[in-house]
Amino acid sequence: YIPSGSMENTLQINDRVAVNKLPFVSGKIGRGDVVVFRDPASWLPEADSSSKSTIKTKIKDGLVLVGVLPNPAKQYLVKRVIGVAGDRIVCCTDKKLTINGTAVDEPYIFKGNNPSEITFDITVDPGKIWVMGDHRGASADSRYHQDDINKGQVPLSRVTGRVFGVIWPFNSAKLVPSIPVLK
């Protein structure tokens, strides 16, 4: 379930996505992948645990139990992988993001957004990734959490899997391919 516009136009608010959780099928997480991950360091507010015990709540709990809906207590996010271990990511020279000194073409960025309004110069640590939303003006991603314990990076151990498609609403169903960040 996509609750915000942080990944527009790749993903829309209220889209339901299919996630490949099998590492031997999905392979290594790489630049350009759209991934689901558990909140690495309090990026999100605490989940509301005061739900009333209604039939709707019980149905939702059942769908969470069988894996159709995400567990709200686990606080999942969806972002695009921009950098992997060892990458030096710098923003922004001439309104371009660079990875390892190479300017990046980002066709997926929401129209009218710059790569970032926040400047940064980060080298991704081993076992971590740097993530950003496609709608940069509406995404509190790695850039906004550089002062947390992970320096805004997401440990690979927190990654649930790679998004491979939108499955609902049905008229919006589509594949979500990885888009190479570096050519």
Model regions: which residues?
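Soluble "head" domains of membrane/secretory-pathway proteins
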Residues: 9, 13-183
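Aromatic-capped interface at the extracytoplasmic side
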Residues: 1-7
